[in-house]
């Protein structure tokens, strides 16, 4: 007698959902939380570069440009942009003295 005949194979009825009371508030809440988590995870993976660049560079104000000549401001902006674009997987921030 082979082992395959000894193993219990589930029938199709056992694979179907047994939760007839799906209107339970806990089940509904868990489903909503699970769906929201999945959506947020997908958005995070799709837009993580934009999101983290915004948090790292957009929310933090740089040094004041008041009284600085326009040419120096443009040079600083180009250096900051090239530092961010230097490595696609890691952000680099150069502090100018």
Curated annotation (Swiss-Prot):
Note: When the channel is activated, one or more imidazole moieties of His-37 probably become bi-protonated.
Function: Forms a proton-selective ion channel that is necessary for the efficient release of the viral genome during virus entry. After attaching to the cell surface, the virion enters the cell by endocytosis. Acidification of the endosome triggers M2 ion channel activity.
UniProt GO cellular component terms: host cell plasma membrane; membrane; virion membrane
Sequence intervals crossing the membrane: 23-43
Residues with lipid group (S-palmitoyl cysteine): 50
Membrane topology: Single-pass type III membrane protein
Quaternary data: Homotetramer; composed of two disulfide-linked dimers held together by non-covalent interactions. May interact with matrix protein 1.
Key words, A-Z: Disulfide bond, Glycoprotein, Host cell membrane, Host membrane, Host-virus interaction, Hydrogen ion transport, Inhibition of host autophagy by virus, Ion channel, Ion transport, Lipoprotein, Membrane, Palmitate, Phosphoprotein, Signal-anchor, Transmembrane, Transmembrane helix, Transport, Viral ion channel, Virion
Virion surface topological segments: 1-22
Short name of one Pfam family: Flu_M2
Subcellular localization(s) per the UniProt record: Virion membrane; Host apical cell membrane
Site description Essential for channel activity, possibly by being protonated during channel activation, and by forming the channel gate and the selective filter, residues in chain: 37
Gene Ontology MF term list: monoatomic ion channel activity; proton transmembrane transporter activity
Protein name: Matrix protein 2
InterPro entries on file: Flu_M2 (IPR002089)
Source species of the chain: Influenza A virus (strain A/Hickox/1940 H1N1)
Compositional bias annotation for Basic and acidic residues: 71-80
Activity regulation (UniProt): The M2 protein from most influenza A strains is inhibited by amantadine and rimantadine, resulting in viral uncoating incapacity. Emergence of amantadine-resistant variants is usually rapid.
Modification Phosphoserine, positions: 64, 82
Glycosylated residues in this chain: 20
The family this protein is said to belong to: Belongs to the influenza viruses matrix protein M2 family.
Seems to be involved in pH gating, annotated site positions: 41
Domain comment quoted from the record: Cytoplasmic tail plays an important role in virion assembly and morphogenesis.
Single GO BP term: protein complex oligomerization
Broad class of the protein's primary localization: virion
Region (Disordered): 60-85
């Amino acid at each position: 007698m082979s082992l395959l005949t000894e193993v219990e194979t589930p029938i199709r009825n056992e694979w179907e959902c047994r939760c007839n009371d799906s209107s339970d508030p806990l089940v509904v809440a868990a489903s909503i939380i699970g769906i929201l988590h999945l959506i947020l995870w997908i958005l995070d993976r799709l837009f993580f570069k934009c999101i983290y660049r915004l948090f790292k560079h957009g929310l933090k104000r740089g040094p004041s440009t008041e009284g600085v000549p326009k040419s120096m401001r443009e040079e600083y902006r180009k250096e900051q942009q090239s530092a961010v674009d230097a490595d696609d997987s890691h952000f680099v921030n150069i502090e100018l003295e």
